[in-house]
Amino acid sequence: MSSFDYLKTAIKQQGCTLQQVADASGMTKGYLSQLLNAKIKSPSAQKLEALHRFLGLEFPRQKKTIGVVFGKFYPLHTGHIYLIQRACSQVDELHIIMGFDDTRDRALFEDSAMSQQPTVPDRLRWLLQTFKYQKNIRIHAFNEEGMEPYPHGWDVWSNGIKKFMAEKGIQPDLIYTSEEADAPQYMEHLGIETVLVDPKRTFMSISGAQIRENPFRYWEYIPTEVKPFFVRTVAILGGESSGKSTLVNKLANIFNTTSAWEYGRDYVFSHLGGDEIALQYSDYDKIALGHAQYIDFAVKYANKVAFIDTDFVTTQAFCKKYEGREHPFVQALIDEYRFDLVILLENNTPWVADGLRSLGSSVDRKEFQNLLVEMLEENNIEFVRVEEEDYDSRFLRCVELVREMMGEQR
């Protein structure tokens, strides 16, 4: 590789032509071309400085120690973080290269206990968010499609990664890994010294496979930015005075986690003076958006499971009941937010007037319950009915349902 390959990479990243770079740097295009190809034995320091200044590069260029970490990060865990933190403190610049292969990644998901498959952007986001304050870390995605899965296919993979690093201008001095068996392979195929970090897992005994098989068992090893992805969501539905809010609070207490309150009630107080008489069609999208924000907050800080008081189907049902039509924005959120467990409470508990309820008759309550069921089925949402009439039995039944759901990963 030429000693000026980094300049070629910088020019490519700028998106400039050689003529534009030459003009801006006070040299001819021919001189620049010869310079980039190391044909000029003693290039002008003044021209080099102008070129570096135009490209936003340091001059004179200081020799940097470059490190690289390879991984799938499927998912990112604290073992990865320990490796990366150790590596980035030993080099001037650390490149994290995340490999992805749609076929392989799909197979890993299907053989796991994960409730959803992480996308490539999900995995990149975990890395970017976790290391966003460390300016010497660079993150890349490398397509490994068609390459034999690890630990096979070293020849094909090494040729691919060499080409990828050359395109990105990455010239590593060191590779960091916790996999003892990989060190000689890296040296043989890439010719780069490898530094082993905690290969015996004495400090951080965890692997991506363990988390994929049982996320909740290894919850403490899942980073803060990754945990929301694994959180299970439980939505409690029902008509007015069915005990949803109290039940959600009790469940969140017993499972030591977060809950999302029904935003519609807060909206009525903050925007309508505490009286639904002023509610109109144009309010429903705002109510749905506010509820989505409550849900996102609850999921972000949840301990394995988050409980949701009322879903968007219920919001849509009220819109249809009072306004005679459905709202497209609410429907979009119905499609976007799918919960792991939906519990529909039967309307067979005493109706309590609280100033915000208007469907108190047995006929109204039954009609609304039927509307909920109809809309859940229309949207292909699976749900479990809880028909116990006393509050304690309802609570115990819901605890049982949640434990069954969580038991898949315990």
From Swiss-Prot:
Q: Where is this region: Ribosylnicotinamide kinase?
A: 230-410
Q: Which SMART domains match?
A: HTH_XRE (SM00530)
Q: In which pathway does it act?
A: Cofactor biosynthesis; NAD(+) biosynthesis [regulation]; Cofactor biosynthesis; NAD(+) biosynthesis; NAD(+) from nicotinamide D-ribonucleotide: step 1/1
Q: Which domain of life is it from?
A: Bacteria
How does the record classify its membrane topology? Answer: Peripheral membrane protein
| Region annotation Nicotinamide mononucleotide adenylyltransferase: where it falls in the sequence | 63-229
**Per UniProt, which keywords does this protein have?**
ATP-binding, Cell membrane, Cytoplasm, DNA-binding, Kinase, Membrane, Multifunctional enzyme, NAD, Nucleotide-binding, Pyridine nucleotide biosynthesis, Repressor, Transcription, Transcription regulation, Transferase
| UniProt-listed Enzyme Commission number(s) | 2.7.7.1, 2.7.1.22
What is this protein's name?
Trifunctional NAD biosynthesis/regulator protein NadR
**Upper lineage ranks?**
Bacteria, Pseudomonadati, Pseudomonadota, Gammaproteobacteria, Enterobacterales
